[in-house]
Amino acid sequence: AVSDLQYLLTFAIMAGVGTSFNLVNGNLRYQAQKHSTLHQQIRQLYEFSRKLSEALVYQQVFDALDEFFPRLFKAKYALLTPSLAEELTVNHNQLGERLDLTIARWVFDKGQPAGLNTNTFAASQVYYVALNSQLRTRGVLALIPESPLDFFLPSEQELLNNFIANIATTLERIHFTQIAIQTEVLLAKKID
């Protein structure tokens, strides 16, 4: 009876140690995978920023968005930017009929997110976020994530905010560059 109790105690201790090692190993594997994913995302965001820094016209921004958005996010998207008359123009639309221009206009005017996972237009399955630059809103990005639970994690939202800030800053830079060119052309015409 004593030896059976001794075997049972030894087995329980070994099972506890084995379970502990398994949990620690699983946690380390998970952390390593998250670190690798984060490293890849940072590298992609850096490449995206570099490509945007070279952009001289809006189409180059749209092309960079088409190239890098699928690499960083598991979501379909639509990009809307204002015309000179402040009308929102759809530049790229993977959302089809689910894109609501009324909600997009509200987001553009207010500069705040709306739709999915917000308190504004919460019934919508689309998440609308403003492309806010230093001076004003430069457009709206509408998204339908494959997995809303993963998409709205703080780390994913931080990545999205950095991504959006890069787009907004680039759109603003291009806008002011175009205004400067137009002004220069007008001044040249007045001199002649």
Predicted regions and their residues:
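Histidine-centered phosphotransfer motif of kinases
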Residues: 192
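Conserved, well-folded catalytic cores of nucleic-acid-processing
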Residues: 18, 31, 38, 72, ...
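Alpha-helical transmembrane segments and their interfaces in multipass membrane proteins
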Residues: 1-15
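Signal-transmission/dimerization alpha-helices at domain junctions
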Residues: 14-27, 159-182
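Membrane-proximal extracytoplasmic alpha-helices
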Residues: 7, 11, 40-41, 68
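Membrane-embedded alpha-helical core segments of multi-pass
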Residues: 13-21, 40-43, 73, 136
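Membrane-proximal helical linkers
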Residues: 23-64, 179, 184-188
